[in-house]
């Protein structure tokens, strides 16, 4: 089902993901702790869990916690600017700051992160196969997709990036809209409008139907990894429930409309689930509105619409 090579491959992917993360220093610290002592014995323990579904998972699950990270901070300088006062100063500090918005970052033992990464490799790759070409953010890399379908548990993943390069896809998303607008103006002589918008509080307004994902696994997943995929999906659902239980005392205050929703910030799987959650929205935009250009990068959306001269 799961071998040492597969676990180490998932760990290397996670380690690479942590390296390029800009704000998740908790994950970076967990990576350092995990491989500092008895690395192979810890890997063996994860393999044994997949072989027997033992009680280790419950111990790991109970260690899931949440760190509150400031997302938006205001000071009296910001208030004065919004009030219409022209206030120029090279003093960038204030005596008091007010935290206006926070993010709830999941923290967990490395074993939990590895299970999450394995879900991304095997289940996430299957979901990503059906995403629209209009989706640019957090797409699974071709090497990871290939690995998930090879069913060779003796091999390790050579490439270590779960997702395609951020900067490449971001540039394609942004430039695609601009280039399409130029093309419509020059070729068709029509006026165009470029609309840019973002989805507010996106991750906290997502509800994941894991039963629906189970049904997709049953219908579309390769037979050789179907049982593994269902097992991973079951465990990820429990991890999501634990995360929501942890944030529930706070989220009713900060995001009252999202008390029963939300996916963990800090999991690789959450990036994939966010794309899956909007898959029908992406298809409806293309089929029902059919703008000259539609592109979505996570929660940032670009439309290009033309108007007949």
Where are the regions a protein language model picked out?
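Conserved two-metal-ion catalytic palm core of "right-hand" nucleic acid polymerases
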Residues: 1-231, 257
């Amino acid at each position: 089902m799961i071998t040492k090579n597969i676990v180490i491959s998932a760990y290397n992917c996670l380690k690479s993901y942590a390296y390029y993360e800009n704000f998740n220093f908790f994950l970076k610290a967990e990576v350092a702790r995990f491989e500092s002592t008895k690395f192979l014995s810890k890997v063996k323990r994860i393999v044994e869990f997949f072989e027997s579904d033992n009680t280790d998972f419950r111990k790991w699950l109970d260690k899931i916690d949440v760190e509150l990270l400031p997302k938006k901070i205001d000071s009296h300088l910001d208030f004065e600017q919004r009030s219409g006062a022209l206030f120029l100063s090279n003093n960038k500090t204030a005596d008091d700051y007010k935290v206006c918005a926070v993010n709830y970052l999941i923290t967990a033992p490395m074993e939990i992160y590895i299970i999450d990464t394995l879900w991304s490799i095997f289940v996430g790759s299957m979901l990503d196969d059906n995403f629209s070409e209009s989706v640019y953010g957090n797409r699974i890399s071709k090497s990871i997709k290939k690995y998930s379908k090879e069913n060779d548990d003796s091999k390790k993943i050579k490439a270590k990036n779960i997702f395609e390069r951020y900067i490449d896809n971001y540039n394609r998303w942004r430039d695609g809209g601009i280039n399409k607008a130029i093309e419509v103006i020059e070729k068709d002589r029509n006026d165009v409008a470029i609309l840019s918008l973002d989805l507010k509080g996106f991750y906290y307004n997502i509800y994941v139907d894991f039963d629906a994902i189970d049904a997709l696994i049953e219908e579309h997943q390769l037979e050789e990894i179907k049982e593994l995929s269902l097992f991973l999906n079951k465990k990820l659902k429990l991890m999501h429930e634990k995360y929501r239980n942890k944030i529930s005392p706070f989220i009713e205050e900060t995001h009252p409309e999202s008390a029963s929703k939300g996916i963990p910030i800090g999991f690789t799987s959450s990036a994939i689930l966010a794309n899956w959650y909007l898959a029908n929205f992406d298809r409806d935009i293309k089929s029902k509105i059919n703008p000259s250009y539609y592109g979505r990068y996570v929660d940032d959306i670009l439309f290009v619409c033309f108007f007949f001269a």
